[in-house]
């Protein structure tokens, strides 16, 4: 099977890049022929790809000459709102190649409202029609399937989560009595991630031995807003702003923490939760994320991201013993082994592609 993935960029920090890159890597390992088309294949900090994955520019794809030498079975488009992705969709339709479209959480109500005036125009010009024309819409959670249905899409949908590699269990010793509870956030430093609520929760935790480490790139100048608020509240010493980390450096961050937080106002999936659980670290996620299973499997907390509720929950967590946290982490690792490996994700995506081809859906 020859599969063409189309995505604006493959920057390491983006969840869309992780999914596209790891699915591509997994597919070529399974013997599939995979090409990824991006706006700029020479951009810095691209997600690492298997050498068998061909990386090209989108502009080079949208030509008749390219198609005559590359007879793709499926075009898999990642993300929304870009005229470039619209052109790729139109190109696939003109050449009768079925499209699988991953919405990657961008149809979430919060996301649809954010900069709505720009999206309103794009929605009615091309995006709604493009999604209706997709052979299959790919969602990573049941919640995302629901979002897409509420927007009126009756296309077949497949639910395939983001995956994770099962990591070696941390060799770092557990927190000793009297040591600070080390709480890690990994992701973009951006308003939707809910970090301002964490800073304000810290104001209610001044009598708790707790340290927050924030790992990820600043976006839209939000980091300076968080730092200023932490200083205003007198909690600056409770925060480490570490900037982006990748590869081994990021693995060390997970190893050193006691738990992960995902306090977002909206989250299609939240791959960092899986990354933490795979390392036997429990996680706290907001009820705006699809992580109720943390409570169901007793490997974390699923709570409101209001500062008061966060503070209340952190006080309870800080009172837990190292053994109790370790037991939660081990249950989380077992959950990942059952449900969230990249091998399982890639197998599910192949089944999705095959369903398109076997039923002649265009």
Can you say where each PLM-predicted feature lies in the sequence?
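A conserved mid-protein helix/loop that constitutes part of the nucleotide-sugar donor-binding site
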Residues: 17-22, 181, 185-204, 224-225
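Glycosyltransferase donor-sugar binding loop
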Residues: 36-43, 186, 211-227, 243-244
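Membrane-proximal helix-turn-helix segments that form the acceptor-binding/catalytic region
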Residues: 94, 119-136
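A short, active-site helix/loop in glycosyltransferases that binds the activated sugar's phosphate group
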Residues: 130-156, 164-166
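Short alpha-helical donor nucleotide-sugar binding micro-motif in glycosyltransferases
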Residues: 244-245, 252-257
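Aromatic "clamp/platform" in nucleotide-sugar-dependent glycosyltransferases that forms part
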Residues: 265
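Short hydrophobic beta-strand element within catalytic cores of glycosyltransferases
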Residues: 282-286
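Conserved acidic donor-binding segment of nucleotide-sugar-dependent glycosyltransferases
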Residues: 301-308, 316-322
């Amino acid at each position: 099977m020859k599969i063409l993935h189309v995505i604006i960029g493959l920057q390491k920090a983006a969840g869309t890049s992780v999914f596209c890159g790891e699915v591509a890597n997994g597919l070529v390992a399974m013997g599939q022929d995979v090409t990824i088309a991006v706006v700029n294949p020479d951009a810095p900090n691209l997600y690492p790809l298997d050498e068998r994955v061909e990386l090209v520019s989108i502009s080079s794809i949208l030509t008749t000459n390219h198609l005559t030498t590359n007879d793709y079975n499926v075009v898999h488009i990642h993300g929304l709102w870009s005229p470039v992705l619209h052109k790729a969709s139109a190109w696939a339709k003109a050449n009768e190649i079925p499209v699988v479209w991953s919405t990657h959480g961008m149809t979430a109500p919060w996301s649809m409202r954010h900069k709505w005036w720009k999206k309103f125009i794009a929605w009615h010009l091309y995006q709604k029609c493009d999604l209706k024309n997709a052979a299959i819409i790919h969602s990573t959670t049941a919640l995302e399937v629901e979002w897409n249905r509420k927007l009126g899409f009756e296309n077949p949908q497949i639910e395939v989560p983001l995956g994770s590699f099962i990591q070696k269990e941390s060799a770092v010793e557990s927190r000793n009595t009297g040591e600070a509870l080390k709480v890690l956030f990994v992701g973009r430093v951006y308003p939707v991630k809910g970090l301002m609520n964490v800073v304000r929760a810290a104001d209610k935790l001044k009598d708790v031995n707790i340290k927050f480490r924030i790992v990820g790139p600043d976006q839209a100048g939000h980091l300076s807003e968080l730092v200023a608020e932490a200083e205003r509240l007198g909690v600056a010493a409770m925060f480490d702003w570490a900037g982006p980390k990748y590869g081994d450096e990021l693995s060390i961050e997970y190893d050193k923490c006691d738990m992960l937080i995902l306090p977002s106002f909206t989250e299609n999936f939240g791959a960092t939760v899986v990354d933490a659980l795979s390392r036997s670290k429990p996680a706290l996620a907001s009820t705006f994320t699809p992580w109720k299973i943390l409570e169901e499997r007793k490997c974390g907390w699923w709570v409101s991201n209001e500062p008061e509720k966060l503070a209340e929950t952190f006080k309870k967590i800080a009172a837990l013993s190292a053994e109790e946290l370790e037991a939660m982490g081990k249950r989380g690792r077992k959950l990942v082994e059952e449900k969230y490996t990249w091998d399982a994700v890639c197998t599910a995506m192949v089944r999705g592609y095959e369903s398109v081809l076997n039923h002649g859906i265009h």
